[in-house]
Amino acid sequence: MTAATIPGLDNAPTKHQGLLEWVREVAELTQPDRVAWADGSQEEYDRLCAQLVEAGTFKKLNPEKQPNSYLALSDPSDVARVESRTFICSKREIDAGPTNNWMDPAEMRGILTDLYRGCMRGRTLWVVPFCMGPLDADDPKLGVEITDSEYVVVSMRTMTRMGAAALQKMGDDGFFVKALHSIGAPLEPGQKDVPWPCNDTKYITHFPETREIWSYGSGYGGNALLGKKCYSLRIASAMAHDEGWLAEHMLILKLISPENKAYYIAAAFPSACGKTNLAMLQPTIPGWRAETVGDDIAWMRFGKDGRLYATNPEFGFFGVAPGTNWDSNPNAMKTIAAGNTVFTNVALTDDHDVWWEGLEGEPDHLIDWKGQDWILRETETKAAHPNSRYCTPISQCPTLAPEWDDPQGVPISAILFGGRRKTTVPLITEARDWQHGVFIGATLGSEQTAAAEGKVGTVRRDPMAMLPFLGYNVGDYFQHWINIGKQADESQLPKVFFVNWFRRGDDGRFLWPGFGENSRVLKWAIERIEHKADGKSTPIGIVPTAADLDLEGLDVDPADVDEALAVNADEWRAEVPLIEEWFEFVGEKLPTGIKDEFDALKTRLAEDS
């Protein structure tokens, strides 16, 4: 079909010439049966969900257990982000850096243009306008995703400010990020569709200079919901580098003291380190309260007062289900229980509720994430996929801070970096200054937790928890962090801390109880900000003693707390060659400031012997 004969192209609800030309160009290439413009309304959402139920993609859940909620089971080949098929196609290879896959942008465009040719036959091309962050921000970050997946359209309504209001914000000539997505599964006339169409060939490609995202072959999560990691981190980090701000893989937490003073904390953790649990913290210390601003992404820029302010660009939670329960994260469970959730790859109970590993009450029988019968104590495989998800509106979170969508953001008092380390890294360490804090973030690592991820216990470096999400060279990224610190007075900058909830004793048990008790560790950090708490200087930074922490009412062996806080110089000397290996991998763009911090650490460790 020519553009002139594709229904829906000529009655677009916008006069934005650049957008109209792009939609027309994509429609001529991909050959959909029709073009539709998503308006973000409840009516549209309900209609598309009903359509997905009819197609077999969604199962409607028991309205008494999960109101207005649905379960989707993906193709077993399409269950997670695919780092090996994710590309940063900068003009020069050096600008992608050693942590990213790179291909020449012209070559990549050629490959993908061939794949996109006719790829939407038999389907609807959806035009999905959206905004990351509040619509009334001074500089709203707008985007348009073109997709042939209704699953994507309904999920984007939950995860972003999507629809007519975002389109209106673009006006007739406003800038927007072009995000093109196809599942790569055209339908011939009369061909029966499958419940989860996708393609074995997958590309998730970013063009940082032109601020474009091209994704092909996957219908799942971060590969397909292009506002999430693709825009909010990979493209936004390139924007932030050019414009003097930070786009980070961080939760934003509001802590309120007994004196009713609010402190905002941004925290970066690699996967499986409890980011969502901390974002929805329930403090155990009397008088302290916590509220949620965001659980995954923080955009930070300086305010007029010289402080660093953070906004959460997202509109929903896209959380990992397994391990989430009424004990580990009651606030996430309350958010989900309010309804309006799309679950993907969890298990289905006999009464059409959902279940996953770690959830209370193990049923005798389930339909697992592959659609097979699962029988308690007989079936050896997991009922829910380890990366199964819930997609639910942030507005339903009972601990949501009222200012979560303030376009000015919230002023950050502390930045935490944290990993999963059995040894070496203390419960909390305060950086000496901003540059030392950047060094701590640059060397952040987590031990591998399963043999499939690599050798168990091997430390995988994940700088600022951004390893899979950097839109440009990691060395330039470290330098950008250092430069950000030079834009403000040191006294105005957030203090930087390094935390490790996961240290273990010689017998393998956790030394610190974690979860809500982590509020005791955060209290010390706040007292350091207020110059009210002591700490001792060590080769790696300032570390509290057990006496410096508020342990009142905590049933824990004082010797365990001492061990959790210990700085063992021999363990740190063993860490030095691991850091050296990582910095060699970063290569020639490793900033001088980071090298200076590393040299200073080695000197302090030598003096400590």
UniProtKB/Swiss-Prot annotation:
Enzyme class: lyase
GO cellular component labels: cytosol
Active site per the UniProt annotation: C273
Binding site for substrate: R81, Y220, G221, G222, S271, N387, S388, R389
UniProt KW Nucleotide-binding keyword: yes
Catalytic function, reaction form: oxaloacetate + GTP = phosphoenolpyruvate + GDP + CO2
Pathway given in the UniProt record: Carbohydrate biosynthesis; gluconeogenesis
PROSITE patterns attached to this UniProt entry: PEPCK_GTP (PS00505)
Cofactor details (free text): Binds 1 Mn(2+) ion per subunit.
EC number: 4.1.1.32
GO-annotated molecular function: GTP binding; manganese ion binding; phosphoenolpyruvate carboxykinase (GTP) activity
CC cofactor: Mn(2+)
Top-level taxon in the UniProt lineage: Bacteria
SUPFAM superfamilies noted in UniProt: PEP carboxykinase N-terminal domain, PEP carboxykinase-like
Key words of the record: Cytoplasm, Decarboxylase, Gluconeogenesis, GTP-binding, Lyase, Manganese, Metal-binding, Nucleotide-binding
Cellular location(s): Cytoplasm
GO terms (BP aspect): cellular response to glucose stimulus; gluconeogenesis; glycerol biosynthetic process from pyruvate; oxaloacetate metabolic process; propionate catabolic process; response to lipid; response to starvation
Binding site residues for Mn(2+): K229, H249, D296
NCBIfam families associated with the record: PRK04210.1
Role, per record: Catalyzes the conversion of oxaloacetate (OAA) to phosphoenolpyruvate (PEP), the rate-limiting step in the metabolic pathway that produces glucose from lactate and other precursors derived from the citric acid cycle.
UniProt subunit comment: Monomer.
Family named by the database record: Belongs to the phosphoenolpyruvate carboxykinase [GTP] family.
Protein name, per record: Phosphoenolpyruvate carboxykinase [GTP]
Organism in which the protein naturally occurs: Mycolicibacterium vanbaalenii (strain DSM 7251 / JCM 13017 / BCRC 16820 / KCTC 9966 / NRRL B-24157 / PYR-1) (Mycobacterium vanbaalenii)
Upper classification of the organism: Bacteria, Bacillati, Actinomycetota, Actinomycetes, Mycobacteriales
